[in-house]
Each structure stands twice: as C-alpha cells, then as structure tokens.
Amino acid sequence: MKIDLNADLGEGCASDSALLQLVSSANIACGFHAGDAVLMQQCVREALKNGVAIGAHPSFPDRENFGRTAMQLPPETVYAQVLYQIGALAAIVHAQGGELRHVKPHGMLYNQAAKEPPLADAIARAVRDADADLVLVGLAGSELIRAGQHYQLTTRQEVFADRGYQADGSLVPRSQPGALIESEEQALAQTLEMVQHNRVRSLSGEWAHVKAETVCLHGDGAHALDFARRLRAAFAGRNIDVSADLE
C-alpha cells in the first residue's frame, strides 16, 4: 500500500528543511499569500535535494490574511491568477533542472473550490492549460476533484491529519470549535483510519467516506516534526510506503 505525504512550504516556517526529509510532496507558496521569488527558489532547491515532488500552492491575492479570507472573484480572474502562479513556480523549477509535478490551491481558495463549481472549473482549466500532465490536488470528494476529472487531469484526493470533519466529508471551518485536532494521538488514529479504511469519524459521530490518496501535514504546529516522524513510523509498521508515485 502507498500513500503520498504532503506539506505546504515557503510560508515562513522554520521547520521547512527538516519537514522535507519526511514528506514525499511539497506545495510551495507562489507569492500571493506568502513567500516571494527568492524563497520559492530556496524551497525548490531544498525539495530537489531531498527528492521531493514539487507542486505549486496558488492562493487568492491575500497576503494580509494569509489567504484565509473568502473572496468572490470572477472565474476568469481566478483562472488568470492561478495560471500566473503556476507559471512563476514552473519557471523556477525548470531553471534548476526539475519538474513541476502538481498543483494544490491554498487556504480559502482551496475551501471555496471544494464547494463552488465555477471556481473549481476555473482552477482546473488553469492547471490543464499550464500543463495537462500536472496532478490536481483537492479535498477528497470535492467539486475541485470533479472539475479535474472533467478536464481529464490526474487528480489526487487529499485528507488532513489534524483537521475535524463534518458528516458530508467536508472540513470543519476554522472559525468553528473542533476545526483543529490538538491531540497527536487523535490525529494519528484519524489518519490511519482514513488511509487504511477510507473513512473518518465526523464531529457528529457519524462515519464519513473519504478517499485518501495524499495526507496533508501542517508544518506550522509546535510539534509538527515530532508528529511527522510518528506518522512515518506508524506507516512503516503497517507496510504503508510513503511515495509521491502512487501507481
């Protein structure tokens, strides 16, 4: 059994270099919510050194609120912004002899695209037009995954180790109680349940179906590295290989 393990990088976290030794995929901020050209270059260099698959992490233009503010932008505006961010990172990756592998939207762009078909469509079109061989990463079972499949992109369905889930398989909004799982034991158990059995216990107590192809690790928590090491050990003990290549 294989699972991809991804982390968002280039967002100003001191643990980026250490985290790159534990994950198989890196989503690099493209300047709209965090990062800049120099930091993008540094992250790409580190990812290539560690053999980690590189992906673009585009966002709404919202540096002030770290890309977590809801926005109602015309789909064509979102299309252009996502295409722009993918292109910027792709150029940096190619200049260093690497290959851009995937795209995963950030923050509120990710959350809104999970539920809003026009937004999901704009993102999927941008990915296709940038490079039809790119993998589109989105919340498991979401509109973004469906849009990617519509455009015949390879999609990767994502689950979260440290986020609470609702009965429909969506994430509990960060503004609500239960959005973040603080207990490492609970996060570990939830992740193994999702990866091995494709289900997650929702806040209401019901099981929600989720297809786990990649697990997101947040690198900004106080114990992020310890948790990543524990998760890798748990996977190894269950013969689950961590790899960006799931085929």
Curated annotation (Swiss-Prot):
GO terms for biological process: carbohydrate metabolic process. It catalyses: 5-oxo-L-proline + ATP + 2 H2O = L-glutamate + ADP + phosphate + H(+). The keyword Iron does not apply. SUPFAM superfamilies: Glycoside hydrolase/deacetylase. Keywords: ATP-binding, Hydrolase, Nucleotide-binding. GO terms for molecular function: 5-oxoprolinase (ATP-hydrolyzing) activity; ATP binding. It holds the Pfam family LamB_YcsF. Its EC number is 3.5.2.9. Catalyzes the cleavage of 5-oxoproline to form L-glutamate coupled to the hydrolysis of ATP to ADP and inorganic phosphate. Forms a complex composed of PxpA, PxpB and PxpC. PANTHER family: 5-OXOPROLINASE SUBUNIT A (PTHR30292:SF0), UNCHARACTERIZED PROTEIN YBGL-RELATED (PTHR30292). Belongs to the LamB/PxpA family. This is 5-oxoprolinase subunit A.
